[in-house]
Amino acid sequence: MLHLEFNSDSENEGIARIVTAAYIMKFDPDMEEMDDIKTAVSEAVTNCIVHAYHNPDGKISMDLSDQNGILRIEIK
């Protein structure tokens, strides 16, 4: 499991994408799968920034885990 916590700032959306891409490399995804997962993470992080926290003082947490080959990404 990997836990990441960052400020609710739109610049940190890119960090979430990079960390996710590095984490999922062990699954050997093709480019389409990689793009789909990174897009989903971007949208989830952006939604947290826009709708949950209206200032950069809010914290967003992201947990990435896998069990039996199933990837789980939780963003809150």
Regions found by a protein language model. Name each.
Residues 3-15:
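STAS-typified acidic loop motif
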Residues 1-6, 26, 30:
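A short, mixed-charge helix-start or loop-turn motif at secondary-structure junctions
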Residues 17-42:
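Conserved short strand/loop->alpha-helix "switch" segment adjacent to the catalytic nucleotide/phosphoryl-transfer site
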Residues 1-3, 48-76:
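Conserved beta-strand-loop-beta-strand hairpin that lines the nucleotide-binding pocket
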Residues 43-47:
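Conserved polar catalytic motif of the HATPase_c/GHKL fold
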